[in-house]
From Swiss-Prot:
GO cellular component terms attached to this protein's record: cytosolic [4Fe-4S] assembly targeting complex
Family membership: Belongs to the NARF family.
Positions with a binding annotation for [4Fe-4S] cluster 1: C26, C73, C76, C79
Stated name of the protein: Probable cytosolic Fe-S cluster assembly factor narfl
Molecular function as annotated in GO: 4 iron, 4 sulfur cluster binding; metal ion binding
Gene that produces this protein: narfl
Keyword Transmembrane helix annotated: no
Length: 522
């Protein structure tokens, strides 16, 4: 197994078992440049490893390495993923530094200069804190110092956009539930499946989404929540809300102070932002590269570059930075950072985003006026990666939720949904919502997190990262986040509104199977 192959989630690696390495054979046809030469030639490997073509007259010609783009991989059904070296050309430290350096060189040309925003995930924050044996707050403050040295403008927290994702997911679930059980009673006579049926499957994990699109296609896609992940919601907020409401205002205020009336020419566009996220998982690079998150008008992606937690360590080495010796910068962007006045992080229970717990409590209140204030008592499956919880009223099960992490549990969920549909089982035996994550133990154990070469040490590292995730936090419900509510009121016209559905929701696409002779093993 190559060094990079364990970076992606297990569901992105095909085989019959949980952990599967990606195939080394890519079936994507490569466009071959036609040559006018009709003579015979042979291919030879040079001492330095280069492949050369030798013609009949002895002339040597170096052969170019066949390459495919990340978008090629996403649009191809030949495999679930490909090797890391194939996938990530524009999602690397070198690309990040190239953009940062180019931006610094454009200081004298304001038309070319971009505002650089970095969004940090709480899982990456916890992993770095565990690795350096410091607090998560110190991690943030030292990162702030480090990024200032690179002339990065802003450091944001993806927990902020997670609150939007939770609220939209919960409202979407309630709408589906009402349509299925209350309004139409699921149209039992015709057996017609609702356009957005139950169970609703969570959508925050890009590894799971990619797997669903390529292996189960049209059957499973209607069940998946249309709500964007926290990463992509932050991409929308940064490129559109932040640009329009904050940066534009600041620019116009500066122009007014300078008696410059040419404000229209100084309007900041989404393409003037370079947005980088730091995530626990390499699959997030796939997500950011989806065409659904590219704006043709402004020619920009919502998230321009994704760096994993481990790549931040590589970045420190590249810049010859002793992270622990960095001073701690106390200036934190209040609106887009989940930090209380007492310097504690606002959080919600669950190191993978807390979708099951939040939606379960939200639905119980909205649908049945039941307040769940006590800790949820889960029924544990064969391991901690599969949990169930249900709500009963007058002896009837009215909500049935599950959490499924890891490939095997995901397969079991998909099989159960298929069985329930084909056999038309009693709805009481079905799930209403399932929180799905590709990685065992969820996002805190993502393939991009900092791990040890000694496998036996990784369990302790995982436990410590989990502790760091819950260190120095205040649990707060997303609905109590006043900054989130302000954006809903001033920009989105409310939760799950038409504007919210336009900006905070997405769609999925069945990837057609292709037949290619290169895929045949003789």
């Amino acid at each position: 197994m190559s060094k990079g192959e364990d970076k992606f989630s297990s569901v992105l690696k095909l085989t019959e078992f949980d952990y599967i390495v990606p195939s080394q054979i890519c079936i994507k046809p490569v466009e071959i440049e036609k040559s006018n030469d009709s003579g015979n030639s042979k291919i030879q490997i040079e001492s330095d490893g280069r492949y050369v073509e030798i013609s009949e007259d002895g002339t040597k010609k170096s052969l170019e390495k066949a390459t495919i783009t990340l978008n090629d991989c996403l649009a191809c059904s030949g495999c679930i993923t490909s090797a890391e070296s194939v996938l990530i050309t524009a999602q690397s430290i070198s690309e990040f530094l190239l953009n940062v350096n180019n931006n610094n060189d454009s200081n004298n040309n304001q038309d070319e200069k971009k505002t650089i925003v970095i969004t940090l995930s709480p899982q990456s924050r916890a992993s770095l804190a565990s690795h350096f044996k410091i607090s998560t707050l110190s991690v943030v403050k030292k990162l702030k110092t480090f990024f200032k040295k690179l002339n990065i403008n802003y450091l944001f927290d993806s927990s902020f956009s997670r609150d939007f994702s939770l609220l939209e997911s919960a409202a979407e679930f309630v709408a589906r539930y009402k349509k299925t059980y209350i309004n139409n009673n699921n149209d039992e006579e015709t057996g017609k499946l609702e356009p957005f049926p139950l169970p609703m499957l969570s959508s925050a994990c890009p590894g799971w989404i990619c797997y669903a699109e390529k292996t189960h296609g049209e059957f499973i896609l209607p069940f998946i929540s249309t709500t964007k992940s926290p990463q992509q919601i932050m991409g929308t907020l940064v490129k559109y809300y932040f640009t329009e409401k904050i940066l534009d205002n600041n620019t116009n205020n500066n122009n007014n102070n300078n008696n410059n009336n040419n404000n229209n020419n100084s309007k900041i566009k989404p393409s003037n932002i370079y947005h980088v996220t730091i995530m626990p998982c390499y699959d997030k690079k796939l997500e950011a590269s989806r065409n659904d998150f590219y704006n043709d008008i402004f020619k920009t992606k919502d998230v321009d570059c994704v760096l994993s937690t481990t790549e931040i360590l590589d970045l420190f080495k590249e810049k010859e930075i002793d992270f622990l010796s960095l001073e701690e910068d106390n200036s934190i962007e209040e609106q887009f950072f989940q930090l209380s006045p007492s310097n504690q992080f606002y959080s919600i229970n669950g190191s993978s985003g807390g979708y099951l717990e939040f939606i379960y409590k939200y639905a119980a209140k909205e649908l049945f006026n039941v307040d769940i204030v006590e800790p949820i008592q889960y029924k544990i499956g064969r391991n901690q990666d599969f949990k169930e919880v249900s709500l009963e009223i007058d002896g009837k099960k009215v909500l049935n939720f599950a959490q499924a992490y890891g490939f095997r549990n995901i397969q079991n969920i998909v099989r159960k949904i298929k069985t329930n549909i084909t056999t038309k089982k009693d709805t009481n035996s079905q799930y209403d919502f399932v929180e799905i994550m590709a990685c065992p133990s969820g996002c805190i154990n993502g393939g991009g997190q900092i791990k040890s070469d000694a496998i036996k040490e990784n369990k302790a590292i995982l436990l410590d990262s989990e502790e760091k995730y819950n260190e120095n936090v205040i649990f707060r419900q997303p609905i109590d986040n006043q900054s989130v509510q302000n954006i809903y009121n001033t920009w989105l016209n409310g939760c799950f509104s038409t504007d919210s559905k336009t900006n905070l929701h997405t769609q999925y696409h069945r990837i057609e199977k292709t037949t290619n002779a290169l895929n045949i093993k003789w």
